[in-house]
Amino acid sequence: MIDPLENGLFDIPDYEQIEDETFPPLPPPLSPGRAELEDDLFGNAEGEEEGEVSKLAEVPVAKRRTVKRPRPKLDANRLISEKGLPALRTLFEDVKFKGKGHETENLKLLMLKMENWAHRLYPKMQFEEFIDKVENLGGKKEVQTCLKRIRLDMPITHEDYVAEEAEIQVPEESVPSGDGGFPEDPFIHSTPAPASLTEEQQQRIELNKRLALERRLAKQKQLESTPISIQEDADEPSTSSSGQFLSEENPKTTSNQTPLKHKPAELQESPLHDNESSSHIANGIIDDDDDDDD
């Protein structure tokens, strides 16, 4: 058998007698003192420059600006906004409730619409909590004023004021002319509704126009009827005074005319009475002035 050591097949150097070279442990990554350790270990000039730079005062880094978005609160101002109580006026316009025997379904539909309205107004609150909060806000002065304006059909939102301006600009041609009517102004004309308005808003504007026209006609009739009553009241004292004046004059005239109309029975039987009745002169008496003229 061939000895491998003799032929040098496995001529491997003997490292058992050689000591291992010791190396210092590596510093942790991205440690603040890494540059100083490198200077001490390797003594490079570049390391010295980096060490000097690291010793300089650190430049303050600009802090990232955070935009704070305040969380909306459910208060009186939010409750009387366009999405709040004024939105309830048109909330059930497209809802059709069923007849008798479907009260449960109608109630569910009503509560569903109210819950939808509450979620749009304040999404971060449950419906039960929302109801309690609205009940507490109901005593606020702003909320009470808003409810009164809704009951009196007064303008609240911007759309209501636009509709009110459209009512004022109703054409005068549609109103019948009269003595007690309003003065006609040729410069007042109706402006067409803007194209951005929805069909529902246009219907509301038309309805407000009709209501304004009806109120205007009623006021015109009232103005036409009031001058007549005032004139009648003013004429009553004059007629009474004139009647009293005539009644005071009548006794004098009647007293003067009684001798002519009612003659004594002795004169009626005399022949002179017959000549007076057949004469063409009134009362059968000839004035002396007429005789002189003849």
UniProtKB/Swiss-Prot annotation:
Biased composition annotated in UniProt, kind: Polar residues: 237-259
InterPro entries the record matches: Csm3, TIPIN/Csm3/Swi3
Bias (Acidic residues) ranges: 37-51
GO cellular component terms given for this protein: chromatin; cytoplasm; nucleus; replication fork protection complex
Annotated region (Disordered), positions in chain: 20-54, 168-203, 218-294
Keyword Transferase: no
GO biological process, one term: cell division
Composition bias, Basic and acidic residues: 263-277
Keyword tags: Cell cycle, Cell division, Cytoplasm, DNA damage, Mitosis, Nucleus
Annotated spans, Interaction with TIMELESS: 74-150
Short name of one Pfam family: Swi3
Annotated localization: Cytoplasm; Nucleus
GO molecular function: DNA binding
Subunit structure: Interacts with TIMELESS, which impairs TIMELESS self-association.
Membership in a protein family: Belongs to the CSM3 family.
Function in brief: Plays an important role in the control of DNA replication and the maintenance of replication fork stability. Important for cell survival after DNA damage or replication stress. May be required for the replication checkpoint induced by hydroxyurea or ultraviolet light.
Protein name (database record): TIMELESS-interacting protein
Organism: Danio rerio
